[in-house]
Amino acid sequence: MAFAPKVIVVPIDLSEHSRKALASAADLGVCFHSRLVVLTVIEDRFPYPDLFSFDHPTEDFYKVMRERAHEELKKLIEHLPHIKAQADLYITRGRPAEKIVEVAAKEKADLIVMGTHGTSGLSHALLGSVCDKVIRQAPCPVLVVRHSAHE
C-alpha cells in the first residue's frame, strides 16, 4: 500500500522555517490531492514573563493575537494559490506541541509537516523541544523540513 496522505497538518508560527514547511506541505498536497490544515498555536503562557508589563494576558490580548495570526495566515495562503481551495486555517491557544498533536488526532491527519525551528531566540532549545514532543506523541508520521543546508 502506497503512502498518500489525504490530510496534512502544518503548524505555522510565521517563522521562515515554518513558511518553508508550508511550501513543502503545499507541494505534497498538490501531488496527493490532500487537504491542508494550517495551524497556528497562540501560547497561553509566556516563557519570559518578566519581559511583559502584565502578569496574565487578557482576553483582549488573545483576541488581537488571533486576528493578527488569521491575517498573516491568509497572506501566506494567498502566496500559494495552488493550495488556497484545499487549505483550512486553524488558530488555537495553548501549548504548541500538545495542540499540534490534538489537532492532528481530531482532523485524522495522515501527516504532520513542520519546520525545524521557530520564532524564539532560543529556537533550537524551544521549538526543537516542540518538534521532538510532536514526533514522539503524534498519531501519524511527522515530516520535519529544514530551512537550509546551513543548519
Locations of the language-model features?
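Amphipathic, non-transmembrane alpha-helical scaffold segments
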Residues: 18, 22, 62-70, 127
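General small-molecule cofactor/ligand-binding pocket signal
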Residues: 39, 88-92, 143
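Structural beta-alpha unit
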Residues: 1-3, 17, 31, 77-112, ...
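Gly/Ser-rich helix-loop-strand patches that form or flank binding pockets
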Residues: 102-151
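Acidic, proline/glycine-rich short linear motifs
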Residues: 41-71, 151
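Short beta->alpha linker loops
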Residues: 68, 91-95, 117
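Small/aliphatic-rich secondary-structure junction motif
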Residues: 2-55
